[in-house]
Amino acid sequence: RGSXLTILPLRNIRDIFYVG
């Protein structure tokens, strides 16, 4: 899931983890 992708803004990180 959103590994790595933490490079994006916190706002997008939340969507990444949710969509993960």
Swiss-Prot record:
Subcellular location, principal: secreted
UniProt keyword annotation of Secreted present: yes
Keyword Oxidoreductase: no
EC number: 3.4.23.-
Intracellular or extracellular location(s): Secreted, Extracellular space
GO molecular function list: aspartic-type endopeptidase activity
Post-translational note: N-glycosylated.
Keywords per UniProt: Aspartyl protease, Glycoprotein, Hydrolase, Protease, Secreted
GO process annotations (BP): proteolysis
GO cellular component: extracellular region
Protein name, entry field: Pregnancy-associated glycoprotein 61C
Species per Swiss-Prot/TrEMBL record: Bubalus bubalis
